[in-house]
């Protein structure tokens, strides 16, 4: 018997249903939802700390939401298939997070668009007759933003065959992780915008506040992950052994890079005197964004690597066409942001007390 043939057969790595595009989609929608929540802190709760950048946060939410679904279309490989998502499967609506997502994305998109219009009229045109409409639109958008994060978490968590993903705390974990990346991205974009597109000086107090928010969310993220991993690795009697093997293989990436570098370090910066120094604040923002992206990558790519019909963990190789699609995705993101700046004539900071 030729054992080389047997070895070749059992070593075939099946292609994952989800790849890098899905991880990027989850990452971008998280930033969009989080920035809408930050804008709502002013438009609903009248938090003065977020007044100057509330409109900027809305723009970030809108642009990231415009670009995010393109990852889903690219992942289908045949864009015409997107029509089937709208036409079929509605009889399974209550048990299909994908169907929830179709409605949530549509309603959230139009809600952000409407809030951009209303807030521009109220804040910059001083048309106070829209104030009440802006308030109610913000409440609706706030609820939809939470729904966006919860639905994407359900997409992952209902995969019962993947033990690393199937946990009831995933919706909360997704929301907190989104707030980490959202606050980090808001720090970076606000700093870049004020530095290069306005004549104003960078207000360290604003960025100190944002770094404290980032640190709080990073702390919550760490606590939830500790609970998650402790149950997975110690108290999950059925699957803890294969989970322990997985952590022996990926532990450095998950514990030291994702949780240590990208969560613990921003936490230290935010809760120490380093939050008064802009370079460290921007470093914390970069790490927060990177950590959330790595978290999504770990869930989607590493989470699907657990063996079911194969004798070992699956290996993932990024397809070149997918990589080009991701690069084009971020190129479009930058182009849309520049277009919005041109449309509003670079006047997107809310003045006054």
Regions found by a protein language model. Give the residues of each.
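Membrane-interface transmembrane-helix boundary segments in multi-pass integral membrane proteins
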Residues: 21-26, 98-102, 170-174, 237-266, ...
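Membrane-helix and juxtamembrane interface regions of eukaryotic multi-pass membrane proteins
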Residues: 10-18, 46-53, 87-147, 152-169, ...
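TerminUS-proximal long segments
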Residues: 279-285, 289-353
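N-terminal signal-anchor module of multipass membrane proteins
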Residues: 1-45, 67, 301-302, 337-338
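Membrane-helix interface motif
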Residues: 2-3, 73-84, 151-161, 226-238, ...
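Membrane helical hairpin/interfacial module
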Residues: 28-111
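Internal alpha-helical transmembrane segments of multi-pass membrane proteins
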Residues: 40, 52, 276-283
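Long, contiguous internal "core" modules enriched in hydrophobic/ aromatic residues
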Residues: 28, 111-276, 284, 291
């Amino acid at each position: 018997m030729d054992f080389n043939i047997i070895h070749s057969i059992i070593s075939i790595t099946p292609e994952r249903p989800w790849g890098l595009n899905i991880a990027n989609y989850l990452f971008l929608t998280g930033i969009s939802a989080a920035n809408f929540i930050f804008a709502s802190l002013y438009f609903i709760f009248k938090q003065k700390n977020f007044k100057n950048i509330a409109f900027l946060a809305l723009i970030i939410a809108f642009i990231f939401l415009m670009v995010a679904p393109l990852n889903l279309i690219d992942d289908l490989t045949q864009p015409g298939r997107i029509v089937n998502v709208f036409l079929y499967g509605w009889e399974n609506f209550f048990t299909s997070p994908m169907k929830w997502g179709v409605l949530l994305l549509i309603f959230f998109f139009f809600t952000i668009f409407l809030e951009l219009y209303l807030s521009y009229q109220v804040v910059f045109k001083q048309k106070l007759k829209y104030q009440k409409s802006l308030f109610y639109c913000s409440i609706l958008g706030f609820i939809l933003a939470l729904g966006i994060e919860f639905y994407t978490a359900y997409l992952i968590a209902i995969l019962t065959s993947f033990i690393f993903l199937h946990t009831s705390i995933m919706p909360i974990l997704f929301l907190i992780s989104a707030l980490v990346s959202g606050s980090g991205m808001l720090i970076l974009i606000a700093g870049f915008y004020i530095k290069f597109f306005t004549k104003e000086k960078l207000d360290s107090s604003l960025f100190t506040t944002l770094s404290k928010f980032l640190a709080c969310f990073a702390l919550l993220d760490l606590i939830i992950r500790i609970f998650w991993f402790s149950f997975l690795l110690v108290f999950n009697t059925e699957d803890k052994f294969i989970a322990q093997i997985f952590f022996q293989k990926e532990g450095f990436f998950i514990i030291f890079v994702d949780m240590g570098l990208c969560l613990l370090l921003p936490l230290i910066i935010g809760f120490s005197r380093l939050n008064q120094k802009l370079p460290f604040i921007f470093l914390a923002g970069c790490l927060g964004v990177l950590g959330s992206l790595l978290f999504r990558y770990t869930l989607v790519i590493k989470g699907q690597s657990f063996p079911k019909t194969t004798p070992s963990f699956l290996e993932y190789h990024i397809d070149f066409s997918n990589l080009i699609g991701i690069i084009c995705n971020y190129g479009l993101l930058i182009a849309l942001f520049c277009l919005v700046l041109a449309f509003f004539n670079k006047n997107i900071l809310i003045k006054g007390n």
